[in-house]
Design a protein with these regions (language model features):
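Accessory terminal and edge-of-domain segments that mediate assembly/interaction
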Residues: 1-108, 117-278
């Protein structure tokens, strides 16, 4: 047996503790009523957009979300009620919440993250619809056997989102990202290494979420707002106005509405303790 626990996870075995167990306890402890959650949910890792939506009266707390750790807000965009959860940063936290979203009835999870530039060919700021991620983190190893990369589990949906984002006039690319658990341990050697392998940006969630999506047959897409770079002398961390970020959500909604039947966002197989068609 390999002595590294992270490389020994029995990914083919059933979990003994499931989201359904936690959801039941949350509803009982917090007196949260039963009810469906939105089919399209956003994980908004920075949190500023959610704060602005709430302050503007565009989003409200969602009463049926069963979670000890987060608050879901409901926002209606182009006639579609969406869920948005802020600040679930990092692979473990993002996947913990994604598990509960899937168990509660979500059909598409979109992660919206800020990111750092790796490829010098990328303009700043720029959007990246993530097609795959380097697995330089730990969470994905609990869902899939060890490998260098993981692909987006919903590539057709990601393509639709890319087209809708391109239509709003902001710079947007499709490509790979490097997912890290330790942003303050990025080195120049690593940046050059991954740039040589056509990686566009670095962030903290995509590989973990993609591995979860593949393992649990859940549609997950990641959109990175690339806003900073160690070799950039201009404005750093500029993702545009919050109203422009709302346009990103609207583009995702249009893609969600346009998913053709042959692609579909069908009900995923029920986990132990879940209802089969929530």
């Amino acid at each position: 047996m390999n002595k590294l626990p992270l490389l020994n996870h029995p990914v083919a075995q059933q979990s003994v503790f499931t989201p359904a167990h936690l959801i039941k306890s949350v509803r009982r402890a917090r007196q949260i009523p039963e009810g469906p959650i939105p089919k399209l949910c956003f994980l908004e890792f920075d949190g500023d957009l959610t704060d602005w939506l709430v302050a503007e009266g565009l989003a409200r707390p969602f009463p049926f979300w069963p979670c000890f750790h987060t608050t879901m807000f409901a926002v209606e965009i182009e006639g579609v009620e969406c869920g948005i959860i802020p600040r679930t940063i990092g692979g473990p936290y993002a996947v913990l919440v994604a598990e509960q979203l899937a168990s509660s009835g979500a059909r598409l999870i979109v992660g919206l993250t800020s990111a750092g530039r790796v490829s010098r060919e990328l303009p700043l700021p720029c959007l990246v619809v993530v097609t795959g991620a380097i697995r330089d983190e730990g969470t994905s190893l609990h869902y899939l056997p060890a490998a260098k990369e993981v692909s987006c589990p919903a590539p057709a949906v990601a393509d639709l989102i890319f087209r809708e984002l391109a239509a709003i006039g902001r710079p947007v690319r499709q490509g790979k990202v490097w997912t890290t658990d330790a942003p303050y341990r990025e080195t120049q050697m690593q940046l050059e290494w991954w740039a040589a392998e056509s990686v566009l940006a670095v962030e903290m969630q995509a590989a973990s979420l993609f591995a979860f999506g593949i393992a649990k047959e859940m549609a997950v897409v990641s959109v990175a707002m690339v806003s900073n770079a160690v070799d950039h002398d201009g404005e750093q961390f500029d993702t545009g106005s919050l109203r422009e970020e709302l346009r990103i959500l609207a583009a995702c909604v249009r893609a969600f509405k346009g998913v053709p039947a042959e692609i579909g966002l069908a009900n995923r197989p029920a986990e132990p303790g879940e209802s089969p068609n929530i």
